Amino acid sequence: MVPLVNEATSWNQGTFFGSIVSSEKTAAASGTIGELRRDPMAMLPFCGYNMADYWQHWVDVGKRDGARLPKIFYVNWFRKNEQGGFIWPGFGDNSRVLDWIFKRCDGAVEAVETPIGLLPTLDGLNLDQLGLSEDAIASLLRVDADGWMAELPLIEDYYASFGEHVPEELKEELEELKRNLEAVTVNVA
C-alpha cells in the first residue's frame, strides 16, 4: 500500500504518517515475529509514555516560532510483488532513494502530488541498471487508493484507542487524507 518513498506536504502530514506507521514485529517487541502491527515513528517499544502525547510533542515542535523544520519522508523498502517477493533490491540501492530525498531537500528534482504526499517522477529517481520492469516500477510508485480507503477505518479505530490524547491536528490530517482519497476515487470512476 505504501509506495517506495513519499514526501510529506507539511509538518503535520509527516507527523500523521509517522503516527500510523506499521511494521513487522521484531525481537524488540512482544508478539509473533513478522506479524504486522502499528509502530508509530518506529518508537513503540522504546516510548515510556502515551504515544499520542508523544505525537503532540512533534505537532508542537512544528508550532515553535522561527522553527526551521526539515522535510519529512516516508519509505517502504519492503513492498512485495504478487509472488510475495520484494520488488525493491534494497541494500546499497537504497542510496538511490536517499539521493532523491537529498535532491528534493535542495529543490533539484520535481515531485508528483498525490493524496498521500509527493512522489518521485519517473525521471527523478535513478533506476538505471536495476533491471526493474515497467510494471515493477509502477508498483513501487503506485498509490493504492483503494487500499488506503480500506485502511481509514483501521486508523480511526487505532486513534480511538488513545482516547482524547490524539492531537486535533492529526485528526484533521486523517480527514484531509480521506477527502483526498475520495476525490481520486471519484475522478477514476
For the regions a language model picked out, list residue spans one by one.
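Conserved NTP phosphate-binding and transfer environment spanning the P-loop NTPase/kinase superfamily
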Residues: 1-188
